[in-house]
Amino acid sequence: MRTSQYLFSTLKETPNDAQVVSHQLMLRAGMIRPMASGLYNWLPTGIRVLKKVEKIIREEMNKGGAIEVLMPVVQPAELWEESGRWDQYGPELLRFEDRGNRNFVLGPTHEEVITDLVRREVSSYKQLPLNLYQIQTKFRDEVRPRFGVMRSREFIMKDAYSFHTTQESLQATYDVMYQVYSNIFNRLGLDFRAVQADTGSIGGSASHEFQVLASSGEDDVVFSTESDFAANIELAEAIAIGERQAPTAEMCLVDTPNAKTIAELVEQFNLPIEKTVKTLIVKGADENQPLVALIIRGDHELNEIKAQKHPLVADPLEFADETEIKAKIGAGVGSLGAVNLNIPAIIDRTVALMSDFSCGANIDGKHYFNVNWVRDVAMPEVFDLRNVVEGDPSPDGKGTLQIKRGIEVGHIFQLGKKYSEAMKATVQGEDGKPLVMTMGCYGIGVTRVVASAIEQHHDERGIIWPSDEIAPFTVAIVPMNMHKSEAVQKYAEELYRTLQSQGVDVIFDDRKERPGVMFADMELIGIPHMVVIGEKNLDNGEIEYKNRRTGEKEMISKDKLLSVLNEKLGNL
């Protein structure tokens, strides 16, 4: 491709509204342009990367036995009503009517459509297992689109759905897809972790997220220093270590009129925060016990996903308001504690090991100091309620936990029969009776993959594609002052034609630009291999080579250039 025949839309300055690196560089590199909030045009450089990512995904999905289909973006409301999600899905679901006043949605996901398709096309257990996938546009009406294509309203996704007669069959395909996803992200050159995850609004049982580690990520990824354990922070088990120490002082009631938060209590009374607890009041699952107290250490954070799994706690978790708390307990939120508490309490594992701690007295403006379990207050039920922190023991007993930010680029679920039962998707079983199919679901955010690769691989000059396979071009030919040197132009043209004939994805910068501008543009868009042709070097029989990823520069004899290039491109 010649730049003179290409839409080469690089920018020198970073747009003010671009907050994260990937958004900034995708705009500067001329990969995308905004059209409306959360909607983007993909320009030639961007679409080249996107298509290469899709190619890798297709190849690995096909190797894993999945079969490609294509389903409509526009979906009839009846399918969503049948699954029950018409009423469950929030405002992210864009609903509209056609000219016949029939309700439709722009698909944020395709569980309903694929279930309807398979129940029409598959009638016997002999046709299963079956794994179908598509690469298709999705739309979610995000309340606050941000970070460019990282969280946009319209995006491209690879979604696959598998159908089975047994849980064992689903598990086998799930394991295959886990490996397929690992292969995809390894080929993309991404530093990622496959983590245990919550199933969220899609539902189901087992679930793994594939998280690309990056400081701009929205998720906390927890992993062990000495094993392959990894989990989303929502699911990472918090292990309490040590033993409860014997009391060393008598419990006493202290006036604390100006200490309504843990921070104020610690500062005003010079207490170690590890010797304080905080009491959070949430709605109960049972109308006979409308309020429940959750007690965690003062420096820990409540894990709402874990807490709402306790049978006494309402799911989804909902905090009680000040009026409800005051009416039931007689004190405000800054003075709550375990002593003389008149509602059920659940304490975190770490709290169960505490002694001589401080907590609210359930009297406004007062706290108890030197509280001890059993001696001063009966030990409540113990449950894992908190988020893990860095340095906690790994739940598998190997090493300690590290926490890094992650960008979710893939998610696999064992859906079970959530959709097939609701939509009566059955096949004839071996015994001749109707059998409800068991389902799996496997998604990759294709556009998000592009952004996450940039988040993880860039420098002050621009993008560094982690794999030659996804760079917009593999080789850049940069002839300096070509329009003033017949020798440079002739050699550049010959090299361009030769590389093209060898199937190399090459961009030939034939613009009438200063060399500095040409170098800057090629580095900005991240071309892995740059061949610089200058008149003086050419007279000496040499060509300059630059490697974007390693920063390597070397002079190569022009007679050996092709063989050296072929060697450097051998990973393709």
UniProtKB/Swiss-Prot annotation:
Q: Which Gene3D superfamilies match?
A: Anticodon-binding domain, Bira Bifunctional Protein, Domain 2
For this protein, the record's PROSITE patterns field holds: AA_TRNA_LIGASE_II
The keyword Ligase is assigned to this record:
yes
Any GO MF annotation of the entry: ATP binding
The broad enzyme category this protein falls into is: ligase
Q: Which PANTHER family match?
A: MITOCHONDRIAL RIBOSOME PROTEIN L39/PROLYL-TRNA LIGASE FAMILY MEMBER, PROLINE--TRNA LIGASE
Q: What is this protein called?
A: Proline--tRNA ligase
Naturally occurring in which organism (per UniProt): Haemophilus influenzae (strain PittGG)
Gene designation per UniProt: proS
